[in-house]
């Protein structure tokens, strides 16, 4: 399901992530080229973020991507449109 697609994953406690779905087994999801969606603006929900992207990229807080991450508490996986993927990837890297 959605393997090799760019997706948004919501974890029960770990948060929200966007990346390329490498594998899924139960509640464990492995993403590559992954960004944590620490704070978003310009989309009403992560569903809207997956469909249209952000209308306010300058307000979003997405740290730098990591090569690979294993999310052990995935409760939602939403495939992204090409426009949404481009929008998420275009957000400037946020650092503290």
Language-model-detected regions and their locations in the chain:
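Conserved RNA-binding domains used in RNP assembly and mRNA/RNA metabolism
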Residues: 1-96
